[in-house]
Curated annotation (Swiss-Prot):
Name this protein carries in UniProt: Shikimate kinase
Cellular component GO terms held in the UniProt record: cytosol
Record GO biological process: amino acid biosynthetic process; aromatic amino acid family biosynthetic process; chorismate biosynthetic process
HAMAP family linked to this entry: Shikimate_kinase (MF_00109)
UniProt source species: Tolumonas auensis (strain DSM 9187 / NBRC 110442 / TA 4)
Pathway connected to this protein: Metabolic intermediate biosynthesis; chorismate biosynthesis; chorismate from D-erythrose 4-phosphate and phosphoenolpyruvate: step 5/7
PANTHER family linked: SHIKIMATE KINASE (PTHR21087), SHIKIMATE KINASE 1, CHLOROPLASTIC (PTHR21087:SF16)
Subunit structure: Monomer.
EC number: 2.7.1.71
Binding site for substrate: D36, R60, G82, R140
Keywords of the record: Amino-acid biosynthesis, Aromatic amino acid biosynthesis, ATP-binding, Cytoplasm, Kinase, Magnesium, Metal-binding, Nucleotide-binding, Transferase
GO molecular function: ATP binding; magnesium ion binding; shikimate kinase activity
């Protein structure tokens, strides 16, 4: 790969962005970053705490800054948070600074992958998880598609197979 382009993974919670990102970075010998992990590193607190103390709006501002900073790097794989695309600024930066791959994942798969994960603030509500995920999908799906250079379904493949498919799609 002569020019090291960035690869940005977007999609809902439970899509496998972090795991698929790991395989992509290993295969392509690119550095891997995870925006949620970077927020935790910078704040010294976990995402749930940031949500509790600063609310979703405060978290999104931090996320916007982290993605702005990381997307300026070259030759990286970045796994974004599921709601990162809510910010027009973030959508513009991702589109302008790399290849955006939307990991499309049905609600059923998201439920199966997130049901035991207590670290997801948007699922820690009275609202049933299926309703939360459906509402988020309705809000975010158009935004994912708006900036996606590629759309890859993740429901029938392992994370490693999805990473291989992305490498083939990108011709890398």
């Amino acid at each position: 790969m002569a020019e090291k382009r960035n690869i940005f993974l977007i999609g809902p919670m439970g899509a496998g962005k972090s795991t698929i990102g790991k395989y992509l970075s290993e295969t392509l010998h690119m550095d891997l970053y995870d925006s949620d992990q970077e927020i935790e590193r910078r704040t010294g607190a976990d995402i749930a705490w940031v949500f509790d103390v600063e609310g979703e709006e405060g978290f999104r501002k931090r996320e916007e800054q982290v993605i702005s900073d990381l997307s300026e790097l070259q030759g990286i794989v970045l796994a974004t948070g599921g709601g990162a695309i809510k910010s027009p600024l973030t959508r513009n930066r991702l589109s302008a600074r790399g290849i955006v791959v939307y990991l499309e994942t049905p609600i059923e798969k998201q439920l199966a992958r997130t049901q035991r994960d207590k670290r997801r603030p948007l699922l820690r509500t009275e609202e049933p998880p299926r309703e939360v995920l459906t509402r988020l999908a309705d809000e975010r799906e158009p935004l994912y598609r708006e900036i996606a250079d590629y759309v890859v379904r993740t429901d029938e493949l392992t994370a490693k197979q999805v990473a291989t498919q992305i490498v083939e799609l990108l011709g890398l």
